Amino acid sequence: VSDFAALSFESSSERPRAMVVGGRTIDGTAVNTRWNLEYESSEGYRIADFSIEQPSFNSLTGTAIIQYDGRLVMFGGVDNDLQWRSDILYSDDEGMNWYVPDTVHNKLPETYASRQNPTVVVDEKQNIYVIGGQSFSGSYSDVYRGYLNELKWAALND
């Protein structure tokens, strides 16, 4: 599998956890898998396939996931019908369920183009940086900075 998103984080139960979402199989098919790996000292590693629990999740490739404000947040990606995503997805339950949040305060600026494989990082002041990515026609070199739940997104390289 290629073009998947991966994130390691501390779960709400304060245990190490990793999440692997989506991707593309060797024949080019996008998948909707969401693997969750959690470590518990008494049991070792446990793995769960959330796509069995919630199969309605769209197949996606080329997304990026961060942990922010107690939830997981997904940016970008392409579905199996080659539809590019520009919306932001939230998960309040560590990757089991995903939804589009209130788009009044949780959307990227009009100048942001849909893309796959962006790099997304959070700094110590809780600024989110969405950096670059790819489209069918090439690569992006733009950088956007903002906060979730606020209309303060800005392109940094205009």
Model-derived regions: residue spans:
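Kelch-like beta-propeller repeat domains
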Residues: 1-158
